[in-house]
Amino acid sequence: MADLFALTEEALAGMDIELVDVERAAMGLLRVTIDRVDGVRIEDCEQVSRQLSHVYEVENIDYKRLEVGSPGVDRPLRNEAEFRRFAGERIEIKLREALDGRKVFSGTLRAPEADGASGQDDTAGAGKAVFGLEFEAKKNDIQVLSFTLDDIERAKLDPVLDFKGKKR
């Protein structure tokens, strides 16, 4: 069987849809997570579902149910393009190795800075982009953690949501 992620990504080419994840779950569920720059609408999910149903049938992909949805407000970040896209947003990262006894950090993501002389991004070693994370180490003590994608175990958006709404 072909790589399911690659097959799905190819099927969505030209649809202005970003494939975030393809996951097999219990009882034959195939869960496909998509995103768009301007947000995922129900019509996008319907269109992707119809397209993938046809492709999966032709390719003999075994599943009982297909679920297509958005990654939600706490979407995972998995590659450099996603980290660059969400620079300036609040994220949470978990490091592979603890730093000062701590692995999980939340703060504002910084994109790699361009070197004034060469116009190239900061890199660590073999051309790996170095991102920054502004976080509050102690009250009113903002620090910046520098990291590459190899340094992290996982990352996700970590927005601050206001559920208070309007008062009556």
From Swiss-Prot:
Keywords: Cytoplasm, Ribosome biogenesis. Its main location: cytoplasm. Pfam families: DUF150_C (PF17384), RimP_N (PF02576). It is found in: Cytoplasm. InterPro entries: Ribosome_maturation_RimP (IPR003728), RimP_C (IPR028998), RimP_C_sf (IPR036847), RimP_N (IPR028989), RimP_N_sf (IPR035956). GO terms for cellular component: cytosol. GO terms for biological process: ribosomal small subunit assembly; translation. HAMAP family: RimP. Required for maturation of 30S ribosomal subunits. Belongs to the RimP family. NCBIfam families: PRK00092.2-1. This is Ribosome maturation factor RimP. It comes from Bordetella parapertussis (strain 12822 / ATCC BAA-587 / NCTC 13253). The lineage of its organism: Bacteria, Pseudomonadati, Pseudomonadota, Betaproteobacteria, Burkholderiales. The gene is rimP.
